C-alpha cells in the first residue's frame, strides 16, 4: 500500500501520473486527511468530483499530535527540512504500515531513512 503525498497528487492532477493511475486501479493507494486538506486548498478543475473521489479512498492511520512529536524525537527527524504535515505523513506511514510516495526530496530522504520510501 502507498500513502501518496500532495506533491504526487498535484503532479497527477496537472499532467497525469501513469504509475499512480495504475496503483489506483489496483487499490494500492491510501489517503491522509491532511493531504486531502492540502489538495482542497488549491484550485481544481472538477473540484467537487475530485475531492469526493479522493475522500472515498481508504485512509491511512492518522497519528495524534503527541504521537508525532514523540516520533520526531525518537527518529531524530528535527532539523531535516521537513514540515509538520510531512512529519504526520511519516508517522502515519509507520503506523499503517505502508510506503510513502512523495516527489519532495527532503520528505523522500526522511522516508528512506525510516525504510518507508517507495525506493526501499
Q: Which ranges hold each PLM region?
A:
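Short, well-structured N-terminal submotif of metal-dependent ribonuclease cores
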Residues: 1-35, 40-52, 119
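Active-site neighborhoods of divalent-metal-dependent phosphate/nucleic-acid chemistry enzymes
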Residues: 12, 18, 59-120
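Conserved nucleotide-sugar phosphate-binding/catalytic loop shared by glycosyltransferases and other
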Residues: 56
Amino acid at each position: 500500500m502507498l500513502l501518496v503525498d500532495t506533491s504526487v497528487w498535484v503532479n497527477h492532477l496537472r499532467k497525469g501520473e501513469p504509475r499512480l493511475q495504475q496503483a489506483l486501479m489496483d487499490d494500492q493507494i491510501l489517503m491522509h486527511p491532511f493531504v486531502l486538506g492540502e489538495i482542497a486548498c488549491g484550485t481544481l478543475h472538477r473540484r467537487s468530483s475530485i475531492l469526493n473521489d479522493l475522500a472515498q479512498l481508504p485512509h491511512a492511520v492518522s497519528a495524534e499530535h503527541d504521537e508525532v512529536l514523540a516520533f520526531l524525537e525518537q527518529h531524530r527527524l528535527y532539523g531535516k527540512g521537513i514540515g509538520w504535515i510531512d512529519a504526520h505523513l511519516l508517522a502515519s506511514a509507520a503506523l499503517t504500515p505502508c510506503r510513502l510516495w512523495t516527489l519532495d526530496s527532503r520528505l523522500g530522504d526522511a522516508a528512506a531513512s525510516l525504510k518507508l520510501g517507495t525506493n526501499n
